[in-house]
Amino acid sequence: MSMTDLLHAEDIKKAVGAFTAVDSFDHKKFFQMVGLKKKSPEDVKKVFHILDKDKSGFIEEEELGFILKGFSPDARDLSVKETKTLLAAGDKDGDGKIGADEFSTLVAES
């Protein structure tokens, strides 16, 4: 399954394009723009599993830095600052990574 099976390619393009400037990434706006906010909990979990590149059941800090690439291969990497901000927003239990339930909560709060 690919991201475009779950989200509209045009929405992905617009959302990724809105945050091309370094340190401009806003996960709440991004999740809304890309259409993730309107998706069912099942679809949000499917998106999580696409972003969990090493299939560990978590999106670790390193994977978070590449989150935009998970939506669009030619997107930029997040800066260290953006990655840390996103991790802090999503990591509810403080284990340094984001699990599927934490990701769902992060999207729901957007």
UniProtKB/Swiss-Prot annotation:
Residues with PTM Phosphoserine = 2, 24
- EF-hand domain location is 39-74, 78-110
Cited SUPFAM superfamilies: EF-hand
Can you tell which superkingdom this protein's organism belongs to?
Answer: Eukaryota
| Keyword Ligase (UniProt) | no
Its transmembrane ranges are none
Cysteine disulfide partners in this protein: none
State a single Gene Ontology molecular function. calcium ion binding
Q: Which residues bind Ca(2+) 1?
A: 52, 54, 56, 58, 60, 63
Modification N-acetylserine occurs at: 2
Q: Where does Ca(2+) 2 bind?
A: 91, 93, 95, 97, 102
- Tell me if Mitochondrion is a UniProt keyword of this record: no
Matching Pfam families: EF-hand_7
Q: Which InterPro entries match?
A: EF-hand-dom_pair, EF_Hand_1_Ca_BS, EF_hand_dom, Parvalbumin
Q: Biological process GO annotation list?
A: excitatory chemical synaptic transmission; gene expression; inhibitory chemical synaptic transmission
GO CC terms in record = axon; cytoplasm; synapse
Functionally, this protein is described as follows: In muscle, parvalbumin is thought to be involved in relaxation after contraction. It binds two calcium ions.
Q: Which family does it belong to?
A: Belongs to the parvalbumin family.
Q: What is known of its domains?
A: AB domain, comprising of helices A and B, is involved in structural stabilization, protecting the hydrophobic core of the protein. It is required for high-affinity binding of Ca(2+) and for Mg(2+)-binding.
- Protein name as annotated: Parvalbumin alpha
